């Protein structure tokens, strides 16, 4: 299994629609504005966060249960920024839609810009032949409100290609998050 380079990522996005929309260079700033970088890097792709957020609030229940999750535990926000309360979390989605090849596993890591502010990004691996918008989870580990910026970089995807295809892909087994669009809540 090997990590894939910017050349491979660019080719797969342009010829096979692996990432849409696709930014073929790393964007660090536009005109005089500062942005958190996004687009292709040497061995990865920095994804952007869309402007749709679900911010967790504990007004309806005392227990968070992944088997019986209360959608009312979130406040929906559409904005260029999202303020996450102290010691809380928010869900969002990537701007980009992914189509992962059958012989590739994709790992997501948070960006240091956010990590150094106490904001942790969590995403499970994107499995072979999974496709959809990636639901992002942001944890604010600080005792102060934390800000997330829409349409800027929030995490980096690393593409690992196996030397052989898997026997059963995410698509083959009818994965419950296949083809997800928008911010997707837990499913069982």
Curated annotation (Swiss-Prot):
Its EC number is 3.5.4.13. The keyword Hydrolase applies. The keyword Hydrolase applies. GO terms for biological process: dUMP biosynthetic process; dUTP biosynthetic process; nucleobase-containing small molecule interconversion. Signal peptide: none annotated. DCTP binds at residues 111-116, 135-137, 156, 170, 180. It is an enzyme of class 3 (hydrolase). InterPro entries: dCTP_deaminase, dUTPase-like_sf, dUTPase_trimeric. SUPFAM superfamilies: dUTPase-like. GO terms for molecular function: dCTP deaminase activity; nucleotide binding. Keywords: Hydrolase, Nucleotide metabolism, Nucleotide-binding. Pathway: Pyrimidine metabolism; dUMP biosynthesis; dUMP from dCTP (dUTP route): step 1/2. The active site is at residue 137. Belongs to the dCTP deaminase family. Catalyzes the deamination of dCTP to dUTP. HAMAP family: dCTP_deaminase (MF_00146). This is dCTP deaminase. It comes from Pseudomonas putida (strain GB-1). The gene is dcd.
């Amino acid at each position: 299994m090997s990590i894939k380079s910017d050349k491979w990522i660019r080719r797969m996005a342009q010829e096979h629609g692996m990432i849409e929309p696709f930014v073929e260079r790393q964007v660090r700033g536009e005109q005089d504005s500062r942005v958190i970088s996004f687009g292709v890097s040497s061995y990865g792709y920095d994804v952007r966060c869309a402007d749709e957020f679900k911010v967790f609030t504990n007004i309806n229940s005392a227990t968070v249960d992944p088997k019986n999750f209360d959608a009312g535990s979130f406040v929906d926000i559409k904005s260029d920024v999202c303020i996450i309360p102290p010691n809380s979390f928010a869900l969002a989605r990537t701007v980009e839609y992914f189509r992962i090849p059958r012989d590739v596993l994709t790992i997501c890591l948070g960006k240091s810009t956010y990590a150094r502010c106490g904001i942790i990004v969590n995403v499970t691996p994107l499995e072979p032949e999974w496709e959809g918008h990636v639901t992002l989870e942001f944890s604010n580990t600080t005792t102060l409100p934390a800000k997330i910026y829409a349409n800027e970089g929030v995490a980096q995807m690393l593409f690992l290609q196996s030397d052989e295809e898997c026997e059963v892909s995410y698509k083959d087994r009818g994965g419950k998050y296949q083809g997800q669009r928008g911010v997707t809540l837990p499913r069982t």
